[in-house]
Amino acid sequence: MGIKQHNGNTKADRLAELKIRSPSIQLIKFGAIGLNAIIFSPLLIAADTGSQYGTNITINDGDRITGDTADPSGNLYGVMTPAGNTPGNINLGNDVTVNVNDASGYAKGIIIQGKNSSLTANRLTVDVVGQTSAIGINLIGDYTHADLGTGSTIKSNDDGIIIGHSSTLTATQFTIENSNGIGLTINDYGTSVDLGSGSKITTDGSTGVYIGGLNGNNANGAARFTATDLTIDVQGYSAMGINVQKNSVVDLGTNSTIKTNGDNAHGLWSFGQVSANALTVDVTGAAANGVEVRGGTTTIGADSHISSAQGGGLVTSGSDAIINFTGTAAQRNSIFSGGSYGASAQTATAVVNMQNTDITVDRNGSLALGLWALSGGRITGDSLAITGAAGARGIYAMTNSQIDLTSDLVIDMSTPDQMAIATQHDDGYAASRINASGRMLINGSVLSKGGLINLDMHPGSVWTGSSLSDNVNGGKLDVAMNNSVWNVTSNSNLDTLALSHSTVDFASHGSTAGTFATLNVENLSGNSTFIMRADVVGEGNGVNNKGDLLNISGSSAGNHVLAIRNQGSEATTGNEVLTVVKTTDGAASFSASSQVELGGYLYDVRKNGTNWELYASGTVPEPTPNPEPTPAPAQPPIVNPDPTPEPAPTPKPTTTADAGGNYLNVGYLLNYVENRTLMQRMGDLRNQSKDGNIWLRSYGGSLDSFASGKLSGFDMGYSGIQFGGDKRLSDVMPLYVGLYIGSTHASPDYSGGDGTARSDYMGMYASYMAQNGFYSDLVIKASRQKNSFHVLDSQNNGVNANGTANGMSISLEAGQRFNLSPTGYGFYIEPQTQLTYSHQNEMTMKASNGLNIHLNHYESLLGRASMILGYDITAGNSQLNVYVKTGAIREFSGDTEYLLNNSREKYSFKGNGWNNGVGVSAQYNKQHTFYLEADYTQGNLFDQKQVNGGYRFSF
């Protein structure tokens, strides 16, 4: 086989050795196989051999080399070439195994010492264990080349592979497993290792890959390490995944993974040039950073993910240290940090550039920073998303550093009170700078402490949090918003606020009740909407009242809208005034987006001097005082009559208060509708010869209630039905006593909405019909009314309320018919009078907007005096009565009041009216009576149109 061995054995000697070591030799003795088959058929040989030494070594496929020879230092080795300029040529074929176990010294697997040597193998396995140290493969000779093919494995209890002196090594699907030492060490200029695809390096106690072009001839170029789909998994204190020193170039291809587990065990530590795509780095030890660059440029492409359980994600710290961490919109990168920061630039020329990256920091409540620039470091970001848990800060710059952000920016802190963007002042340093421009979604506060912060918020931006600018060290906070929203969560101040079609909302965030915010702005410009809240009541009647406040200390410009939130639960009186905007120049213009409902009254915004204030609609502003004029010489007094005082303006109720207060009118009018005349209830009872009646009537119409007091008018359609029966008590006395029940349904339309009302009632009556034309009618009624309404407030929010009240009434009616014909038939006149007393209980409603509406009870005494002109025709057992009527009505009582959150408003039903009507009552066969009436009432407080019809059966 032409094998040159360290012990100089011949072929015969080799066979003798095989006789001992190989079971194949036993087959020769029995003639099973020939000698030529053993010599010339290597597929049948899996030989064990000892240490191999020389310049030309060839090992058969599948052979096993066991280190049994020591080098001059007394250390066992497996394969070794001599040192010097004589190149070695080592061919280890396929599936060869090299085992070295030095129980007392330094175990060496394969040592290539000759210059320009070569090592070839495929599916090679090297397994070395040494007492003091071990090395799997050591390529010492200058310009040595090793090709380890596919699927080779190096196992060592110390170092895996050391290569230097501008040598090269290639392999694919390569495995290094070792403890204590470094998995792969690449030294010197020009040294190159290419591990192809699918290789794996596992170490326990030290670094996975070390590369440093620090020695040798720099003309040979940088040291290089190349791999793709590489896995590095290391354990131990300061055990780095890859340690890249100066003059080194590392290309990790695509889908490589680095895992470390140990304190200070960084994933990638670099002073050189590193590139990777779809890189995963996962480090779990204390103070272990994912990627730390101390020099050179590290470029990490799309779909890369860095996770550090207790350290930083990315950090640059050193001269011209640069990290480019570049994801794409389709394949975003990510950083997770459970330690100090997500990404950090920590020295004057250190830079971190990121694109399309999601950053999460969570240190279990302790301080952590999403982006951290310090000591002159610079961070740039394009389309970043930062999520900060409790205790974290989103973006932080200090000690003359700079952060520049563009495109979409998301900063989501766990609460709006946490710092989303902040600078820190440090004595002796220039102000740090943070610039952001793009569409922003920020949940957190922005604080300029001795720094310069500029936010240019593009359309669709939303910021929820507060702001602070302390103006130390020339620091400023300038914000420009275009079609964006700022939800102000607490007292804030900034230097410049330039708004274009944007909203500043003091009210959207769920702050503590009664807690308001003041926004101090030095310079305001543009056009915007400010959404605000107000407690105009304060300690009562406006004393020490408060609300959200916009305070402009410098220049103001533009046209702005104030949208002040309605608050129905406010116990207002309509006399309060509250300043909501303060300016020094009064140059900007502010107007209300709508009237404001506070309690039961409407408020508006007006300018007073250079400020704007909230006041109850209808009140007159206090005049701005003029300077006292220079006194003129005394003149004789001229006495003028006092001018006629103008009516004092009154506050206007809200739509909710109006609908609630108007239920006084609804209840009053329902009573009016239900308590009608005897003719309307039962038709003409004269010439009645029967003992009893059963009757049914229905009615319907419309009412228009006029504005009165502070209540606006409304109209109401209604319909109802009554059913009753009576019995004549005696043949000699025409007195009928009966019972009835009824129900009325109404649909009031208010100025701000509509509602429903229902009255269910029952009662009894006694009617007396004398032969001389006199009659009287007594009616007693008890009722229960239910009311509900739905209105839109001044800001188009729906408001609902409902309530129930009981009432009773007593009505006494009397009249006398005078026939104008001696026959007793034909034309007649009939004067009538009626007096109705009603009592309505109090009622309380709480509207859905918080307004409490209390309607006091009231008494009503309604009088009516009417005249009927009719024509009566009798034919056999039938009778027809046609009539017209007219009369006056008057409310003698009806004083009441209603309370809007305990603010009293008086109301009265007193007034006069005129009632006119036409009707017919037809009796057939002295049993069946049909009656119909239409009438119209015109009064001071309401108008009514009604049609009434019924049927009576007499028995």
Swiss-Prot record:
One of the GO BP terms on file: cell adhesion involved in biofilm formation
Region (Disordered): 616-659
Keyword set, alphabetical order: Cell adhesion
Disruption phenotype: No change in cell adhesion or biofilm formation.
Domain Autotransporter: 687-955
Residue intervals passing through the bilayer: none
SMART domains tied to this protein: Autotransporter
PANTHER family, per database record: ANTIGEN 43-RELATED, AUTOTRANSPORTER
Name of the featured protein: Probable autotransporter YcgV
